[in-house]
Design a protein with these regions (language model features):
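Pyridoxal 5′-phosphate
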Residues: 1-399
Length: 399
């Protein structure tokens, strides 16, 4: 393996400033290759797709290239990749489409571990459709989402199960495959939020059993583009509320309005960058992604082990969540300080962390901290290094 974090960090202009970016769960920094791809798309001239002239042909090329890249990233079918402004918008779009197939007396299952973007769209459209919403609860001691509870929650009237592949605050990774097996045994669809998880390991939507998988490129070094991946056959069954003049093919029928073609160039560049995190990776782009993301996960978790051990040793620190299987993300409070105070003090030392609920609305309510500022989140990325961890720990200890 050749995962060289020093080599990697040199590729990111933002990392040259000296700032410690422990806010990867909110959005990652972009390497020069992604920035250049987007800038080049502007420089060569921009157009809508579907035309016969060069800039329009290039816009179509960038769209296809982005779909191909996202499909490689998650082991999906490029014909089923829907590109949009963000995961929240796409989820609302598909909640509307799916709700038109629901009937009174049916139900769907959401979880209290999820980001609100994989909760509220389903709850709101279920209410409009007269469909029951059932809740999967977290284990408050560990921050895990026990999969066995789904055997009681899912029945023959369940139409959809929405669950995260990793909590954006606790880092907990549910057993998505076990949950999907239960859902599919009742012929329910699985909608998996991969926004937080995608950057932190290898994704295989087939292995997960995800009928729909959503992710956002800005969480893995790319621009602000949301991605939904499903089988094209499943997409064909869904109605899209769109302009009469818009394409009716899939995935195009779900891509409303004029797309961000220049950002699509950045999506493909970001996936190519991820495939080269380990510069010894060989084979197809998918094979290089697997090698590189495994190496990146090992790197992140080695750093995180040291960071977490130091926080656990500090008697002033209160930690939330201790899942056995997790991402390199920690959610904590420091006795005597509000979460905002901690975040503000670290910002003064040029260390970026987030305080607050981070849209984990149900998680923070279940933990009993939502009304008191929630907690502080520190999240590592593949470009994090020992110095980042050292400076973070020193700053916390200085409080």
């Amino acid at each position: 393996m050749a995962f060289d974090v020093a080599r990697l960090r040199a590729l990111y202009p933002a990392l040259q400033s000296g700032t410690v970016y422990l806010d990867g769960a909110a959005g990652t920094q972009s390497p020069s290759s992604v920035i250049d791809a987007i800038a080049d798309a502007y420089r060569r001239g921009t157009s809508n797709g579907g035309g016969f002239f060069d800039s329009s042909v290039r816009a179509d090329y960038d769209t296809v290239a982005a779909r191909d890249a996202v499909a490689d990233l998650v082991n999906g079918d490029p014909r089923g990749v829907v590109l949009g402004p963000n995961m929240t918008t796409l989820t609302y779009r598909f909640a509307q489409a799916l709700s038109e197939t629901w009937r009174s007396g049916e139900n769907l299952v959401v979880s209290r571990l999820d980001h609100d973007a994989n909760v509220r769209p389903w709850v709101q459209w279920a209410q409009r459709a007269g469909v029951e919403v059932r809740w999967a609860d977290i284990d408050l001691a560990t921050g895990e989402l026990p999969s066995e509870q789904y055997r009681e929650l899912v029945d023959g009237r369940t139409r959809l199960v929405a669950v995260t592949a990793a909590s954006n605050v606790l880092g907990s990774r549910p057993d998505v495959r076990a949950i999907s097996d239960i859902a599919h045994s009742a012929n329910a669809l699985m909608y998996v939020d991969g926004v937080h998880s995608t950057a932190h390991g290898v994704v295989d939507i087939e292995a997960l059993g995800a009928d729909f998988y959503v992710t956002s490129a800005y969480k893995w070094d790319g621009p602000h583009v949301g991605c939904l991946i499903a089988s094209p056959e499943l997409l064909e069954t869904l109605h899209s509320h769109k302009l009469a003049s818009s394409a009716n093919d899939v995935p195009d029928r779900f891509e409303w309005g004029t797309p961000s073609f220049h950002n699509f160039a950045g999506v493909a560049a970001a996936v190519d960058h991820l495939a080269a995190l380990d510069d010894a990776a060989t084979g197809t782009r998918r094979e290089r992604l697997v090698t590189s993301l495994l190496a990146a996960e090992r790197h992140e978790m080695a750093l995180f082990k040291r960071l977490l051990a130091a926080l656990e040793a500090d008697p002033r620190v209160i930690l939330y969540g201790k899942a056995a299987h997790r991402t390199a993300t920690v959610y904590f409070r420091v006795s005597g300080f509000s979460p905002d105070d901690v975040s503000r003090e670290l910002a003064a030392q040029d260390i970026n962390v987030w305080s607050g609920h981070n849209y984990a609305w149900e998680v923070t309510a279940a933990l009993g901290i939502r009304d008191t500022g929630s907690a502080v989140r520190a999240s590592l990325a593949h470009y994090s290094n020992d110095d980042d961890v050292d400076r973070f720990l020193a700053a916390v200890q200085s409080l």
